[in-house]
Design a protein with these regions (language model features):
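N-terminal, post-signal peptide beta-strand-biased segments of exported outer-membrane/organellar beta-barrel
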Residues: 19-107, 120
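Outer-membrane beta-barrel "beta-signal"
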Residues: 23, 187-191, 498-510
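Membrane-embedded beta-strand positions of outer-membrane beta-barrel proteins
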Residues: 57-59, 97-99, 155-157, 183, ...
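Transmembrane beta-strands of outer-membrane beta-barrel pores
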Residues: 61-65, 101-105, 159-163, 189, ...
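Outer-membrane beta-barrel translocator domains and adjoining extracellular loop/strand segments
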Residues: 67-74, 108-114, 164-172, 207-213, ...
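Residues that define the transmembrane beta-barrel architecture of outer-membrane proteins
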Residues: 76-82, 133-139, 173-181, 252-258, ...
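Outer-membrane beta-barrel channels and translocator barrels
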Residues: 90-93, 146-150, 188-190, 265-269, ...
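Long, internal scaffold/assembly segments composed of regular secondary structure
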Residues: 232-370
Length: 510
């Protein structure tokens, strides 16, 4: 009992960021142009101080504890990091920049070998618990320059690099790179603003696995999830897993994206944006392409803003995503002692459609108090997997939301928040296609022991509370402690019902 109390106290005061925001983050949260894809709009952000800018730098450390988590996460995880941000106005030029570094470690981890499980329409699983360490570096730089009275041009570049390592067989090392470039333009006339921007983005991640211990390779199995936890289970270096193939010693994934967005604003009271992005992803390299997964994303945002004793805005967002995953029919042909890959065709084995509609509103008083309410009115996910003659389908409808309220008095600022998530509809089925014949083949293999807890964690009803207290020492220096508790309900497959998080932050605003 005493040990549990100590863990709770430690978790309450030490963890990942969940509480109050800096002035820089508040500006990013409340301003339409900083929420849009048009960096040229930062010239429209007003400043009411002589410094014409806001900046911050912060050190942080944290811990998470509890068994209410995705099966690929750790019961106990801890980390630390540093971050900084700045937004500055010069006579004709405005600049935005952010930087962050973080390290997170979890013990007794296994499951998904990717840095962010669920990022792709496939996944790789290993089953030997061990410690994993994730390091992430990221920066963003943006610039907007005014040309005359009507035009502003700008550009933004974002870069993120991450490395992920497990130190126990099956050992694996991941490297991820994410680079995006967004040029933009803004036209200004009286109270009207019209903008346009382009997006070019490249994402890549590779998984390199190895075995150093004396055990035979047959002692370690892996699973390639091709959709809805259906797939191939073999020894980790088997040909069906693609972790150790002839000529390839890693599992690489590459995604190239391009698209554009249009923005409009009327008197800074009514603003809107619509964006379209097309992505082409593939797994494999050197001609050995195992999967190809194109994706289309359409998003829209509308914001209403008004003033008075409480400055308030309402923002409505929609995002629709459609993805298909094609598995190639691939062979190796040897000629003259040289082995080359030959692709005979491809089969669509997985489809995914996601729609999300959300609303958020914030109100800020002139005395330093305020509230932020976020509600996801609908989140409808449809997924299907085909392994002839069987067809699996999953349909889910979720709702979630969170609420925060803060108040400043003297050097203190207190923040209290609550959140929830629940499933409104959930149906999973496996059927035989009408033209599948009378002699039914065996059902496709499913990693049920991982599917059930993962599915439950994503859909289980839950609610959470969070509390943060910040003390301002003067001259911009501050210290903050924060903590949160999440509790799940109606659980059957997860090992725990709660997770606690907390953290300490020390920073400077200037």
């Amino acid at each position: 009992m005493k040990a549990n109390v100590k863990v709770f106290i430690l978790s309450f005061f030490l963890a990942l960021p969940i509480g109050a925001q800096t002035r820089f983050e508040e500006k990013v949260e409340e301003d339409f142009w900083l929420q849009s894809r048009n960096i040229s709009g930062i010239r429209e952000i007003p400043f009411y101080s002589a410094r014409r800018g806001i900046s911050f730098a912060e050190l942080r450390a944290g811990i998470e504890s509890g068994r209410f988590h995705d099966p690929s996460d750790a019961d106990l995880a801890y980390g630390a990091g540093v971050r900084a941000g700045t937004l500055v106005h010069l006579p004709k030029t405005s600049m935005l920049g952010t930087f962050s570094f973080s390290e997170r470690r979890g013990d007794g981890m296994c499951g998904s070998m990717f840095i962010t499980p669920g990022s792709y329409p496939f996944d790789l699983f290993e089953f030997t618990p061990g410690g994993k360490t994730l390091q992430t570096y990221a920066f963003t730089g943006g610039l907007a320059h005014t040309l005359g009275q009507a035009w502003t041009i700008g550009g933004k570049m974002s870069f993120e690099s991450a490395n992920y390592a497990k130190k126990k067989d099956i050992r694996h090392t991941n490297y991820r790179l994410d680079l995006s470039v967004e040029p933009s333009v803004l036209y200004r006339h009286d109270d009207y603003r019209l903008g346009a921007s382009l997006l070019l983005r490249k994402q890549s991640e590779s998984v390199s696995a190895e075995q150093i211990g004396s055990a035979t390779a047959d002692s370690y199995f892996a699973f390639l999830d091709k959709g809805l936890f259906y797939g191939t289970s073999q020894v980790w270096n088997g040909s069906g897993i693609h972790l150790a193939e002839t000529g390839l010693n890693r599992f690489p994934v590459t995604i190239l994206s391009y698209g554009g967005a249009l923005q409009a604003s009327l008197m800074e009271k009514l603003c809107g944006e619509v964006a379209y992005i097309h992505s082409e992803g593939e797994a494999g390299e050197k001609g050995f392409t195992w999967f190809r997964f194109p994706e289309n994303t359409l998003s829209a945002m509308v914001e209403f803003r008004w003033g008075g004793s409480i400055t308030q805005w309402v923002r409505i967002r929609y995002e629709g995503r459609s993805l298909s995953n094609y598995e190639t029919v691939l062979d190796r042909v040897t000629s003259g002692g040289i082995t080359l890959p030959v692709i005979y065709g491809e089969n669509r084995i997985y489809r995914e459609r996601k729609d999300r509609l959300s609303m958020e509103t914030e109100g800020i008083t002139h005395g330093g108090s305020g509230f932020l309410l976020h509600l996801a009115a609908a989140r409808y996910d449809r997924r299907s997997f085909l392994m002839f003659p069987y067809y699996a389908r999953s349909r889910e409808v979720l709702a979630d939301g969170n609420f925060s309220i803060w108040h400043s008095f003297g050097p203190w600022r207190m923040t209290l928040g609550a959140n929830f998530r629940t499933s409104l509809f959930d149906k999973d089925s496996l059927e035989m296609l009408p033209d599948g014949g009378t002699a039914a083949e065996s059902e496709p293999y499913r990693l049920t022991e991982w599917y059930l807890p993962s599915h439950e964690f994503r859909l289980a009803p839950r609610c959470g509370l969070r509390l943060a207290a910040r003390y301002n020492f003067g001259k911009g220096f501050y210290a903050e402690g924060e903590g949160s508790l999440v509790r799940g309900f109606r659980l059957a497959y997860l090992d725990g019902r709660a997770r606690i998080m907390g953290g300490l932050h020390f920073g400077l605003e200037f």
